[in-house]
Each structure stands twice: as structure tokens, then as C-alpha cells.
């Protein structure tokens, strides 16, 4: 691994999994994505979830209003699936270009998921509609039964939910989001072209020791939680393999500092300001930079059936200090790698 300065140029990337929140938080964080990314799949888990076309249109409007002048960015909206979601909302939203995909949250799996699906069979009729439309299903892949250890929830999800689901709907396009385990990585590698996965920078850079040894680091706490080193290494090997069904999804999820640094802290890593340097660092460490552009900019559009972005960004191998905090509504947001020297500096070239 060299420390010499050099520059790589890639197609403008996309973020296939992000949380913008709403209100002042949305207005604060959107520019950190819109400046560098061409598109982003926007998660629908607001306090009042995005379950209908009308609410998706309104939310998209609020996002568009937060994009700084000059940024060429398109938010791609998703529908939050519930036990009572109407298939007409999915079909109309997809055909009108409002919904790009639907999101499956097992009930109570993560932030604002209490409205999620209680039993996957409850939405089988919806999945049949999606399969017919060619509409992707985005999956938070964890079971939530109280007796299952939090570190085992993803692996158990594959056995109990994902495999039966894919057997029932073999033509359904499925994104296994923010995978964290060797079991998930292997499952996707062995899958067909209808199965893909996103990976976050924190799960590629760190494991649970980084979060827990020598003191708890709450700004590394997210769901699914960081796992053992063996799982981290499996994720790194997966992206380094060049498999075109792995792509960038930051799962950037901002919370105010006081909500992270508390006796019962919120799950979520706000990584939008530092995600691209972090990903580049991992690919460099894995001697996989030849696959970096595909992971960031090509694999996602291929899976979703969308054109690649026309613009470009440049990443230069030189230190660039990550901002320590971002002010938001009289509170602070602490970004991923806050105050640290990232190895890469990023700029837009078009």
C-alpha cells in the first residue's frame, strides 16, 4: 500500500441506502450527499412512515428543496411495507416513477420500524405484485425474536425469511441491505442475478472490538451491529472479489450527539461526509482499487436497470481531515471518523 499522492477518477457514484430524516435535520444533511452522489435510495422510516404515493411525493419535494444550487442529484423514493399496505399504492407509485423500490423492515428491527412487517407471509400478495412489476425489494435482514442473540439475527434471517421468500418469488429482485456477516456475504456470492447487497463503510472498516474495547464508542453503534473480525474480513473479501452484485450503500443515519452519547443511545452512523474516503481506504488496503468504480458507480445502476451517471469525481491520495461536528438546530451531528485524517480527498470534476 503506497502513501504517495495520486488521483483516481470515477463516474459520479450513487448511494443505494441513506436516511435523510426530515425537517431541519434533512436540510442539514442532504448537501453532504447531493454534492458527490448522483442519486440515493432514500429510506422511508420517518416518524410517520412513507407508505403512500402522496406522502412520497411530498417527502421528495422536501428533499429537492434542500439540494444546494448546482448539485445534480436525484432522490429515489421507497415505500415502507406494512402488514396493511395496499398493492395499488405500490403499483401506481412504481408506474408513475415515484417509488423505485419497497422496503421491508421486520417490526422493531431498527429506528422507526414499529410499523414494520410482523410476518413475511402477510405481504406475500404485495411481493407477487412487485415480482410482476420488476420492482426491487430492499430488506433489513434481521429477525427480531427476543430470544435470538443480536449478533445472530442476520444469519438466522437468511434461514427463516430470506431463503423461503426467494424460493416463493424466484423472479423478485432483492437487495440484502447493509450486510454484516460472512453468512450473508457467502449467500449473496452464491446467489443469482436477482440478489444483490449493499455494504456500509463502517462494517468494512471496523468490527465490534473497535466499538467496545477500551471504552464504548457510540458513534460506531448501528443496526445491524458490528460483528466479529471474521465477518468484517468476509465483507472486505466480498467487495474485493469484483462481484457485480455488491454496491455502495452508506446507511448514513444521523442522530443528534446527545441522542448517541446517552444511557440508551440511538443506532445509526452519520457517514455521508466521509463515506467515499472510507470506502477508498478499504479498497486500497485490499488491493482492489480496480473494482472501486464498479462498486461505487456501476453495479447499482446495473442491478436497478438505470443508466450510469454522466459526471465524474476525483479521489486524491492525500490526507483530508474529517469535520469534527456539524451544527443542526442548536445540536451537533458527529460524523463517521470525526476529526480523523482520511487518506483520500474527494472533489467533483464536472
From Swiss-Prot:
Zn(2+) 1 binds at residues 17, 19, 103, 251. Pathway: Pyrimidine metabolism; UMP biosynthesis via de novo pathway; (S)-dihydroorotate from bicarbonate: step 3/3. GO terms for molecular function: dihydroorotase activity; zinc ion binding. Its cofactor is Zn(2+). Zn(2+) 2 binds at residues 103, 140, 178. The active site is at 251. Homodimer. This is Dihydroorotase. It comes from Photorhabdus laumondii subsp. laumondii (strain DSM 15139 / CIP 105565 / TT01). The gene is pyrC.
Amino acid at each position: 500500500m503506497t502513501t504517495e499522492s495520486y488521483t483516481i477518477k470515477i463516474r459520479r457514484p450513487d448511494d443505494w441506502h441513506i436516511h435523510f430524516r426530515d425537517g431541519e435535520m434533512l436540510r442539514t444533511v442532504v448537501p453532504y450527499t447531493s454534492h458527490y452522489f448522483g442519486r440515493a435510495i432514500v429510506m422511508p422510516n420517518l416518524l410517520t412512515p412513507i407508505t403512500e404515493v402522496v406522502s412520497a411525493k411530498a417527502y421528495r419535494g422536501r428533499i429537492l428543496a434542500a439540494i444546494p444550487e448546482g448539485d445534480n442529484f436525484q432522490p429515489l423514493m421507497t415505500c415502507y411495507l406494512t402488514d396493511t399496505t395496499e398493492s395499488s399504492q405500490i403499483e401506481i407509485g412504481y408506474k408513475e416513477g415515484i417509488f423505485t423500490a419497497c422496503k421491508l423492515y421486520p417490526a422493531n428491527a431498527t429506528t422507526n420500524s414499529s410499523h414494520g412487517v410482523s410476518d413475511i407471509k402477510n405481504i406475500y400478495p404485495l411481493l407477487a405484485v412487485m415480482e410482476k412489476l420488476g420492482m426491487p425489494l430492499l430488506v433489513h435482514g434481521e429477525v427480531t425474536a427476543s430470544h435470538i442473540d443480536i449478533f445472530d439475527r442476520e444469519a438466522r434471517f437468511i434461514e427463516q425469511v430470506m431463503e423461503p421468500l426467494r424460493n416463493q418469488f424466484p423472479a423478485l429482485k432483492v437487495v440484502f441491505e447493509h450486510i454484516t456477516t460472512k453468512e450473508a456475504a457467502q449467500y449473496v456470492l452464491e446467489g443469482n442475478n436477482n440478489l444483490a447487497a449493499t455494504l456500509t463503510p463502517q462494517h468494512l472498516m471496523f468490527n465490534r472490538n473497535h466499538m467496545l474495547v477500551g471504552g464504548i464508542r457510540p458513534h460506531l453503534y448501528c443496526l445491524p451491529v458490528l460483528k466479529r473480525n471474521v465477518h468484517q474480513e468476509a465483507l472486505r473479501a466480498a467487495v474485493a472479489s469484483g462481484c457485480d452484485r455488491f454496491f455502495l450503500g452508506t446507511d448514513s443515519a444521523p442522530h443528534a450527539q446527545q441522542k448517541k452519547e446517552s444511557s440508551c443511545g440511538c443506532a445509526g452512523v452519520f457517514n455521508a461526509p466521509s463515506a467515499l474516503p472510507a470506502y477508498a481506504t478499504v479498497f486500497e488496503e485490499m488491493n482492489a482499487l480496480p473494482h472501486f468504480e464498479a462498486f461505487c458507480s456501476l453495479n447499482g445502476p446495473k442491478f436497478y436497470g438505470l443508466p450510469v451517471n454522466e459526471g465524474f469525481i476525483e479521489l486524491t491520495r492525500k490526507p483530508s481531515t474529517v469535520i469534527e461536528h456539524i451544527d443542526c438546530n442548536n445540536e451537533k451531528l458527529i460524523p463517521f471518523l470525526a476529526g480523523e485524517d482520511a487518506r483520500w480527498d474527494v472533489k467533483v470534476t464536472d
